[in-house]
Amino acid sequence: MPSGFFRAANNAAIAADARADVARRLANATTGWNVVAVGTNGRPGLGLRAAKEEEGIDRALTDCNRQDLRCHVIAIGPFSVEPLPVSTQP
């Protein structure tokens, strides 16, 4: 599995219209486990501030499955989130 920095603002797996919101929500989730899942159409699901890794995964997949199909986890962990580039800030 690849490792490194996860950048929601430019991650091609996430639908373009959802990237800034995912990045903002991750930046605000400063404690616990944070998980991002996406489905076949790139609709994201988030599991934020979970006490346990498994809890975050379950939340993200449940959230994703409400709006997309065949959801899978694309990022997991306590994130260090960098600010959005000036051109993509709301």
State each model region's role:
Residues 1-90:
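Secreted/extracellular ectodomain signature
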